[in-house]
Swiss-Prot record:
GO cellular component, one term: cytosolic large ribosomal subunit
Protein name in UniProt: Large ribosomal subunit protein uL6
Natural source organism: Nostoc punctiforme (strain ATCC 29133 / PCC 73102)
Alphabetic keyword roster: Ribonucleoprotein, Ribosomal protein, RNA-binding, rRNA-binding
Gene3D superfamilies associated with the record: Ribosomal protein L6, alpha-beta domain
Gene name as annotated: rplF
Amino acid sequence: MSRIGKRPITIPAKVQVAINGTNIVVKGPKGELSRTLRDNVSLSQEGEILHVNRRDETRTSKQLHGLSRTLVANMVEGVSQGFQRRLEIQGVGYRAQLQGRNLVLNMGYSHQVQIEPPDGIQFAVEGTTNVIVSGYDKEIVGNTAAKIRAVRPPEPYKGKGIRYAGEVVRRKAGKTGKGGKK
């Protein structure tokens, strides 16, 4: 029995939900999201409460029950509050800046790396070393933040690179010398 799938989803006042079979459209102040769920689950709405139900007790239905509920809950939260992901840049000379909507990264390469935001995504830069990726679709926010981090992932010896805020980088010991030249 999926404990996550059994939890009801509360719909905020400014959010409208339209259910058409396995299709769901969620509209809110931040934007509009739609998704087609699998046939193994069904949606039912009672006032401001949304329930995700299984159609049968097969193993696949049980697996998709909690997943579908979480996806719908993320849609509701995204269009009402939105999501954001913070990234930190560490390293001498590494910095970020905005050019229009695009994010420009100086990461020690011979060229600047320009990242164009997908639809519904905004970049913000605090100082020159903190980047905030925000939007209403949790999946796209996470994928965009992962693309930015992939430009220069943190290396294990000095920890230089782009990391998520609060990420702990596993450090390695460097080479130990023999005691000098002879």
